[in-house]
Each structure stands twice: as structure tokens, then as C-alpha cells.
Amino acid sequence: MSSPVRTPPPERLEPNPGMSYAVMEIAIIAAVITAVALVLVCLLFLMLRYLYRHKGTYYTNEAKGTEFAESADAALQSDPALQDAGDTSKKEYFI
């Protein structure tokens, strides 16, 4: 009598469960690093654009003729925009 032929069990087609978690973690880490790098590049672009567009735009609002005055008080007393209709003997200085 011949012995029955045994067939080997079918191979599992499922991937190794430990390996799938490792691949998934690598994909998540790569996505986060890519997102952070993209945000940093965008911020760098916006900062360089801002610095380029606002280069040398510094405007002062000083009274005209202040460079020829003896002191700051003398320059401000002659400025018509700062002339007060009230009494000039009372002066208040805010520091």
C-alpha cells in the first residue's frame, strides 16, 4: 500500500505584520518631514520677498528745519503744526 501524498500547506500571502508597521511609520515620518520642509521654504520665500520689497523705505516725520535749530525745544516752538493757542508759559514734558 502506498502512503497518501501530503500536500504542503499553502503559503501565506499576507505580509509580515511587523514589517507593515515599519513601512507605515517610515511613510508617516517622511510625510511630516516633507511638510515641515515645505513650510520652511515658503516662509523663507515670503521673508525674502518682504525684505526685497521694503528695502530702503524708511520715512521720518520730523519737523522741517530741525537740523538748523539750536535745540529740540527751539525747533518745536517754531513748527506751525505744533503751535498751541493756549498759554505758552505752561510747558509739560512727557518722558
From Swiss-Prot:
Residues 1-25 are extracellular. Keywords: Cell membrane, Membrane, Phosphoprotein, Transmembrane, Transmembrane helix. It is a single-pass type III membrane protein. The chain crosses the membrane at residues 26-46. Residues 47-95 are cytoplasmic. SMART domains: 4.1m. It is found in: Cell membrane. GO terms for cellular component: cortical cytoskeleton; membrane; plasma membrane. InterPro entries: Glycophorin-C, Neurexin-like. Signal peptide: none annotated. The modification Phosphoserine is found at S71, S78, S89. Its main location: membrane. PANTHER family: GLYCOPHORIN-C (PTHR47614:SF2). Belongs to the glycophorin-C family. This is Glycophorin-C. It comes from Rattus norvegicus (Rat).
